[in-house]
């Protein structure tokens, strides 16, 4: 099927949207994206939502797909759900041209869902800014925008907590204080975000708190603590993460497996090999991926496989 024919199908609400068809929207550029935009407003709202939702699912399963041009165009959609889904779809994008549109949504959009999604997607660029992979002025714009919404008294909790998670990559006493205040706030959701932020900061000074929270009675907190251990990458956390492999909550178990893959080391590797024998398909699959991550980190060029 030609791209023109598929565009026509998208506008027809009687035709079922299939993942196989949406693959044709990957990598659109130039005249192709202009043509799609010309038809976009004729597509019913519910169908536009479904299209963007399906593309987001596809990207999560296959990082080789590139719907960034479509997602970026949808940031201007008149429907707030489409804008929010599009902003979230850009979470893993490193296209620097979307920094300003995301900042505009974060600071100015009327929808709290859109603002929160924009805050999440700016997190990737915050990391890039700290690594010197974006212009300094863009990094500063990101930091200032995130700090602004965190400081707003009338901002939604969801937007503030996502902004805290994203701003954590910036190394400064002010950011450290924000994380501490969120942790001590008493709100369970803010505490979850604070623990995630501790890991995102890559500051080992947070390690004692993160380790302590692996024993929390709240599974959501244990999940974030496991994730934070993985992001901190400190081998001292490994025994505490291993203890979570037998957690009653399956999501905590999976977070622990991923964390061990991120931390690496011989102890993590042995624990993950034991996970292959647990008889849980999800845990076994996650453990295989984690072991591959450890092997790649140890031998990124694949030299050992050639010897």
Show where each model-derived region lies.
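HEAT-repeat alpha-solenoid elements in large eukaryotic scaffold proteins
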Residues: 7-15, 41, 45-53, 117-128
């Amino acid at each position: 099927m030609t791209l023109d024919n598929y565009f026509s199908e998208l506008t027809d609400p009687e035709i079922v949207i299939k993942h196989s068809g949406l693959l044709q929207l990957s990598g659109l550029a130039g005249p192709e994206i202009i043509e799609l935009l010309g038809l976009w407003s004729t597509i019913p709202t519910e169908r536009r939502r479904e299209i963007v939702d399906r593309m987001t699912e596809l990207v999560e399963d296959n990082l080789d797909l590139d719907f960034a041009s479509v997602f970026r165009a949808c940031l201007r959609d008149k429907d707030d759900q489409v804008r929010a889904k599009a902003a979230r779809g850009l979470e893993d994008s490193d296209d620097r041209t979307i920094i300003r549109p995301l900042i505009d949504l974060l600071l100015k959009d009327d929808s709290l869902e859109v603002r929160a999604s924009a805050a999440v997607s700016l997190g990737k660029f915050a990391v890039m800014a700290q690594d010197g992979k974006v212009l300094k002025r863009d990094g500063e714009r990101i930091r200032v925008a995130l700090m602004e919404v965190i400081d707003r008294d009338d901002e939604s909790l969801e937007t503030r907590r996502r902004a805290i998670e994203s701003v954590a990559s910036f190394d400064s006493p002010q950011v450290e204080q924000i994380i501490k205040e969120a942790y001590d706030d008493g709100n369970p959701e803010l505490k979850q975000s604070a623990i995630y932020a501790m890991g995102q900061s890559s500051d080992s000074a947070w390690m004692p708190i993160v380790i302590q929270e692996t024993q929390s009675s709240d599974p959501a907190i244990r999940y974030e603590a496991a994730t934070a251990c993985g992001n901190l990458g400190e081998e001292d956390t490994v025994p505490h993460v291993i203890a979570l492999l037998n957690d009653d909550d399956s999501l905590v178990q999976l977070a622990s497996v991923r964390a061990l893959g991120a931390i690496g080391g011989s102890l993590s590797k042995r624990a993950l090999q034991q996970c292959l024998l647990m008889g849980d398909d999800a845990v076994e699959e996650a453990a295989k991926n984690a072991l591959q991550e450890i092997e790649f980190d140890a031998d990124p060029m694949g030299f050992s496989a050639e010897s």
